[in-house]
Amino acid sequence: MASEASPSSSATRSEPPKDSPAEERGPASKEVSEVIESLKKKLAADRCISIKKRIDENKKNLFAITQSFMRSSMERGGSCKDGSDLLVKRQRDSPGMKSGIDESNNNRYVEDGPASSGMVQGSSVPVKISLRPIKMPDIKRLSPYTTWVFLDRNQRMTEDQSVVGRRRIYYDQTGGEALICSDSEEEAIDDEEEKRDFLEPEDYIIRMTLEQLGLSDSVLAELASFLSRSTSEIKARHGVLMKEKEVSESGDNQAESSLLNKDMEGALDSFDNLFCRRCLVFDCRLHGCSQDLIFPAEKPAPWCPPVDENLTCGANCYKTLLKSGRFPGYGTIEGKTGTSSDGAGTKTTPTKFSSKLNGRKPKTFPSESASSNEKCALETSDSENGLQQDTNSDKVSSSPKVKGSGRRVGRKRNKNRVAERVPRKTQKRQKKTEASDSDSIASGSCSPSDAKHKDNEDATSSSQKHVKSGNSGKSRKNGTPAEVSNNSVKDDVPVCQSNEVASELDAPGSDESLRKEEFMGETVSRGRLATNKLWRPLEKSLFDKGVEIFGMNSCLIARNLLSGFKSCWEVFQYMTCSENKASFFGGDGLNPDGSSKFDINGNMVNNQVRRRSRFLRRRGKVRRLKYTWKSAAYHSIRKRITEKKDQPCRQFNPCNCKIACGKECPCLLNGTCCEKYCGCPKSCKNRFRGCHCAKSQCRSRQCPCFAADRECDPDVCRNCWVIGGDGSLGVPSQRGDNYECRNMKLLLKQQQRVLLGISDVSGWGAFLKNSVSKHEYLGEYTGELISHKEADKRGKIYDRENCSFLFNLNDQFVLDAYRKGDKLKFANHSPEPNCYAKVIMVAGDHRVGIFAKERILAGEELFYDYRYEPDRAPAWAKKPEAPGSKKDENVTPSVGRPKKLA
C-alpha cells in the first residue's frame, strides 16, 4: 500500500548524503544549523502573529453574527401575544390532535377505541373527531434516469475519466455491494511513492539559507536532512525560485519586449498548441491540443485587389506622402536642401527627388520606390562626376587656358571630399546593386517607350562610346564644356532623366546643388538603414507573412498584420529597401529555376494555377462525367465496399508529405485516402478528389462520396456548395433542387426534432416530432471517444445494469454515450427497426448518423438494430431462432464487451 511505502521512502530521503571530504566546501554544518534554526524561530514568531491577527478578525466576525441572531430572536419573541410560546401553540394545533389518531398505534385509525382527547380550535372542550383515511392512488414509479451531459459533437475522453487500472465498486439493485476486481495481475495498481509539494515555509528557508550561505554541497546536505528531502530536489527547487524571482522583478514591460524580440514561430507557440487547424477552434475537445503542425505544400497565390491611385488607407499612407513630398523622419526634401543663389541673385531649388517621387505610380514594383529613385539619383551624380572628371582632366592637359577650367578642378576636389564622406559599405552596396538598380530605373522611372529606347541604346552603347572617345578632341575644341558634359551624360543616364540632369548642370550654382543632393541622398539612405534596424524579429516575420498573403501591397499588410506596430509608410520604406528584396523572393518567393514568382505589380506569376474544368467552361452542355476508380486513392475504399464491408473503418491521421505521396506515405500504409488536411500537393494520386455529381443530389451509389460512406465536402467536390449565413439577412436564390447537394446533413447539422419520453419497450425512449420520409437524416449519435480497452472495462458495469451505450466507431475508437451524448442515445433496440445507423466520414472524422429506414410518422418511437455480435449480444438483443434450425458450432467466440455496430 502507499501508506506502508511512504515511511520507508521518507526515511531514505531523510538520510543525509555522505559527501566525500573533497566535496565538503563551504560553511560548517554548525553554522548552517544555526542559520536554519534562526529562520525556523522567525517563522514560528511570524506564525504566532498571523494566528493572533486571525483570531481577532474571527472575534469581530463572530460578534457581528451573534448580534444579528440575537436581534432576530427578540423580534420573534415580541410577535407573540400574552407571552404564549409558539412551540406549544403549534403542538396544540397539530393535525394528529384534531383527527384523534393514536400515534402509539403506528398512526392507524381505531374506530372502536376510546376517543382521544383533541382540542378543537376555538373550543376548550375535548371532542372526538371521526375521519376516515384517504388512500392515495398507486402511481407507477418512474424509470431510473442517469444524469448526462449533452454533446452536439463527439469529444475525446480525458485521462482522468479512464477506468483502466482502477477498481470499480458496483451497487446492485438489492442494495448490496459487489467489488469488481481486475482481470489480471498486470492491471493491479502500482504503489507509487507519494509526492510532496514544497510548502511556503520550506521555500522561505531554502531561499534565505542559500542567499546567506551560498550554494554548496554542505548547505544542500543540511537542508535536505532538515526538510527530509534529497539534495537534488532542494537544488531543483532553488532554481525554480530564482526563475520566479527574475520574472517578478522584470515586470510586464520586459515580458512584452521579449515577446516582440521573438520571431513569429516563437510568438505563436501557444497558438499552435491550443488552436486546432482542422476544426478552426481553440482547445478542441475532439483532436486535443499539441497537434502536429502540418502545412500544405501548395500555397495559394497572394490576394492582389485592384489598385486605386486615389484610394488611401490613412494619413500615413505612402500614396499621400509621396504626393505631398513630406516624409516622416526627415521632413520635406525641399526644406532640407534649401535654396542656392548665384552672384546675380537667381535662386534655384533642387527638385530632383521630389519630382521623381511625386511622379511615381502606385502600381509599380518595389524597385520603383523612393529608395530606388534616390539610389538612381546618387548613381546619376556619380556618373556625372566621373564623366566630368575625365573631361576636365583632358581639358586641363590639352588646353589649360580654357575658361572655367580652374572652377571645374575645384569641383572635382569637392566631389572627392563628398565621396569620402559617404560610408564605404554604402559604396560597396551600390556597386553590387548597380545592375539591378539600373534595370529598376529603366522600368520604374521611365515610361514604357523610354524603357524600350533605353534597351535599344544599351546594345549600341559600346560603339557610341568608342566614337565619342575618338572625337573627344574635336568636341573639346569646337563645343562648349556644358555641351561636352551633356553628351557624355546622355550615354549612361536614362533618356527620361537626361534633360533634367542637363538642366541642372547648366544652371548657375550647379556645383552647390549637386553637393546638397549628394548629402540629401546620403541622409535618406542612412535614415532608411536606421529604419530597417528598428524592425523587431516579430515584425519582420509578420511582414514576410503579409507579402505571402497580400503580395507587395503595403496598405493591406500594415492594416491587417502590422496594425499598432508599423504604419503604411514604414512598411513601404522597408519593402522598397534593396537589402530586403532578396528576402521577398527567397524561399517560397522563388520558382525552382530561380525566377521570381512576382511580376512588376507584385502579382504571382509562373505559378501552377489549377486549370479550369471543362465542365465549368462548357456551361451549355452537360457531358457524362467519367469519374475514375483506378487511382490508388479508391483502392482501399473499393476493396472495403466489395470484400470487407463489415470490417471497421480506419482512423484517419493526416500525412506531412511535401511531395506527391509514395509507397511510404502514412495514409497509404494505413489504408486511408489523403485528405485536404494533409501536407501533400493536390496532384497526389492517393488524395480523395471528391465527386462531380450534377443532378443526382449525391444520394445514390453513383456518387463516389456516397458509395464510400463519406459526406460531400464543398472544398473538394465540384458542384456541392453551401449557402452561408443563418437566413436572417435573406437567402440567395437557389439554382433548383437538381443542384442542391443532399449529402451534407451531418456537416450542416440539419437534424430532425427528437423528443424524450417513457418507452413502451424499456425505460426511456426517443420519439420523432415531425413526419419524415425514407432515408431521411434524423440526427447524430454523439458521445465520448474511448479506446477499445476502455470500452471493455466500462462494458462490465453496463452489462450488470442491462443497458448499453457503446457504439463501435472505427479500429481505434468507440463511442460511449453513457455520461455524455444526445437524445438519440435513448433509441431502443428492435429486431424490426424503423431506423438504421451508419458510420460516415465527415471532414476527416468518423461520425455516426441515424437515418429513417422507412416512412416514420410524427410521435412514433425510434428503433434501430444494435447489430451485436451473436456471441456477445445480451439475451434481450438476440434474435429468436427459427424452429428446426441448427446451432452453428464452428463460430469462434469474439473477445470484448458487446458494442453497437453500424
Curated annotation (Swiss-Prot):
Main location: nucleus
Compositional bias (Basic and acidic residues): 15-33, 78-95, 875-890
Basic residues biased stretches: 404-416
Disruption phenotype: Misexpression of AGAMOUS, recognizable phenotypes (e.g. curly leaves, and early flowering time) and loss of H3K27me3 histone H3-tail marks. Double mutant plants atx1 clf exhibits normal leaf-phenotype and flowering time. The double mutant clf-50 swn-1 is hypersensitive to abscisic acid (ABA) associated with reduced ABA-responsive genes repression by histone H3 'Lys-27' methylation (H3K27me3).
Biased composition annotated in UniProt, kind: Polar residues: 337-357, 459-473
Ranges for domain CXC: 638-737
Region spans: Disordered: 1-33, 73-107, 335-522, 875-902
UniProt keyword Phosphoprotein, yes or no: no
Enzyme class: transferase
Comp. bias (Low complexity): 1-14, 394-403, 438-449
EC number, UniProt record: 2.1.1.-
Subcellular location: Nucleus
Reaction catalyzed: L-lysyl-[histone] + S-adenosyl-L-methionine = N(6)-methyl-L-lysyl-[histone] + S-adenosyl-L-homocysteine + H(+)
Highest taxon, organism lineage: Eukaryota
Xref: Pfam families: preSET_CXC, SET
Record-given protein name: Histone-lysine N-methyltransferase CLF
Record organism: Arabidopsis thaliana (Mouse-ear cress)
